[in-house]
Each structure stands twice: as structure tokens, then as C-alpha cells.
Design a protein with these regions (language model features):
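Short acidic-hydrophobic catalytic motif
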Residues: 1-199
Length: 199
């Protein structure tokens, strides 16, 4: 996710924005001195904790709302992702993911109340497939990524020299891998990747 104004762009804002929304913050100023938000632990939890540590101040200005009055569907250019927004009297979010992967296939997550966000969603980490890492690094992305701040999914067999090369791109030491799965499990929830997409 990228925010832009004129020539200025900042990316990977979604963890912070989710935390702000969950905490009820709709007006704040955040200074960033890089083109990418810090990944921290790969979740929204550090942002929630920071907001909780200072609290939220109610302002006298009236809050502006966007009211959903009809179904809206947004689809990515490649057609692989979509978001459907439906009018309702209560807030809820459902996320469904479907990857062509023997490790991460179909998953589903639901959030019926923002009161559940901190305990059920905020700590769910971002994830990446080993087979995509080299391409992401070459594109100048995942600059702060490592085994401590993302679930790393190993779903396509590779020999150790290939894994060593990928790790070198990240400035990391490659783990010794003997089977397909999550390189840095265990998962916090069986559907942690879907919960992260919900975030």
C-alpha cells in the first residue's frame, strides 16, 4: 500500500493504518524519513502498543464518515485480488486467501468487532514465499525483512545453495531446511496468514 502526494511517496503503511483505525484514531500526524514504513515485527502490534502507551485524545471537530450505501467491488489489474464492500449496520471484515501452494492454500478469517482486533488480528505477521524473495529484493522491496518479522513460506523445493543466495540478498544466514513448511513457525493461529490479510 502506497500513499503519495506529488513526488512524495511512502509505502507499507497498512500495519500502522490498521492500528490507527482499530484504536479509533482518525486524525494524526506521522513523520516518516524514508520511502517505506518500518516493518518492525511484521504486524500491527507494535503500532497498537505505541498508541495504547500514549492514549487517544478526543477532538472537538466533527468526524466525517463515508457511508456505504450500495455494493462496491474493486479488483486488481491482474484480476487475482478483489475487495467487496457491502452496506451494513455493523462493522465486520472477512478475508479469504487462496494461494497455489502446498503449504498455504485456502484460508479464511473474520473480524466481527474492532474490540477483537488487538487480541485476534494485530499480532498476525506478514508473510512471504521463499520463491518470491529474490524478485522482491531486486525490486527494492522488503528492505527490512528477515526471519524475525515475517512468516517465511518454503513451498517449492530448492537446494541449499539457492537458499544461501536468497539469504545473502537479505544479508541473513540461510537456515538449514529439510522439509516444506514455515521456516520460522509456529503460527500464532492456524489461519495467521488470512488474519494478516484481514489486517
Amino acid at each position: 500500500t502506497v500513499l503519495a502526494k506529488g513526488e512524495v511517496k511512502v509505502s507499507t503503511i497498512e500495519h500502522c493504518m490498521a492500528a490507527l483505525y482499530a484504536a479509533g484514531v482518525d486524525n494524526c500526524e506521522i513523520e516518516v524519513n524514508a520511502p517505506e514504513f518500518p516493518i518492525l515485527d511484521g504486524s500491527a502490534k507494535p503500532f497498537i502498543e505505541a498508541i495504547n502507551s500514549v492514549g487517544v485524545e478526543e477532538q472537538s471537530a466533527e468526524r466525517e464518515y463515508y457511508e456505504v450505501t450500495s455494493k462496491k467491488v474493486f479488483t486488481s489489474e491482474d484480476g487475482k485480488s478483489s475487495i467487496t464492500i457491502l452496506p451494513d449496520t455493523e462493522f465486520s471484515v472477512q478475508a479469504m486467501v487462496n494461494y497455489d501452494s502446498c503449504v498455504l492454500g485456502n484460508q479464511y478469517a473474520i473480524l466481527d468487532s474492532m474490540n477483537e482486533f488487538e487480541a485476534e488480528v494485530a499480532g498476525c505477521r506478514t508473510f512471504v514465499f521463499v520463491r518470491e524473495i529474490a524478485q522482491l529484493v531486486e525490486a527494492g522491496l522488503i528492505k527490512g525483512g528477515d526471519l524475525t518479522n515475517a512468516l517465511v513460506i518454503y513451498d517449492t523445493p530448492a537446494d541449499q545453495s539457492q537458499l544461501d543466495k536468497i539469504a545473502e540478498l537479505l544479508g541473513q544466514t540461510a537456515p538449514q531446511v529439510s522439509e516444506l513448511g514455515y521456516l520460522n513457525g509456529p503460527l500464532q493461529f492456524d489461519n495467521e496468514p488470512a488474519r494478516h490479510k484481514l489486517l
